[in-house]
Regions:
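Gly/Pro/Ser/Thr-rich low-complexity, intrinsically disordered segments predominantly at protein N-termini
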Residues: 1-184
Length: 184
């Protein structure tokens, strides 16, 4: 299993990030350069199924746009969430090469090597940056935790297992049958 590597030899910036020219995936949080392992097939299958459902919802409701594997900038910090949604009234944050500011919804599919990072550092960055809703999808436990912004931190709005239907406070009327997302 690949692991997450954090480089702390100096403070990294988005300018440094743009100069990286190998095939690895990187993120920068708090000036630290993080080498993120590539997603595995099961991870990608779950993301693909979520995209299908969410794209249908967004198109039908003309609610916004969905982006995958895109650089999201919070100042000099850059991350590439598995999936983000920008609601239609905030599409101005979408630039030619990145998203400059907080998406409305961020979805991270956990892997053993990134779970702690997604739950702590990225979660804190998303909250501080202004993300409205954050989903943590756990393929091994077959559940999704949905968090919404509280006054000082995230509030868990729901925890849904593979036998349940996920509801999103941010996307009225959205219902996701998780058995369809987690099926083998």
């Amino acid at each position: 299993m690949e692991s997450l590597t954090i480089l702390t030899d100096r403070r990294y910036t988005y300018e440094d990030y743009l100069k990286l020219d190998d095939d690895r995936d990187y993120e920068i949080i708090g000036g630290k350069l993080i080498v993120v392992p590539r997603p595995r097939p099961r991870h990608q299958k779950i993301v693909s199924r979520l995209v299908t459902v969410l794209e249908g919802y967004l198109r039908q409701n003309r609610a916004g746009e969905l982006y995958l594997d895109v650089d999201v900038l919070f100042g000099d910090q850059v991350v590439s969430p598995d999936l983000v949604i920008i609601l239609k009234d905030r599409l101005s944050i979408v630039q030619e090469t990145n998203i400059s500011g907080a998406p409305d919804l961020v979805v991270e599919v956990l892997s053993p090597s990134t779970a702690k990072y997604d739950r702590k550092e990225k979660s804190q960055l998303y909250y501080a940056g202004g993300v409205q809703e954050y989903w943590l999808v756990d393929p091994s436990l077959q559940l999704v935790e949905v968090f919404v912004r509280g006054e000082k931190d995230w509030n868990r709005s729901g925890i849904y297992d593979e036998s349940e239907t996920l509801f999103s406070p941010l996307l009225p009327g959205l219902e996701i049958e998780l058995k369809d997302i987690f099926m083998e």
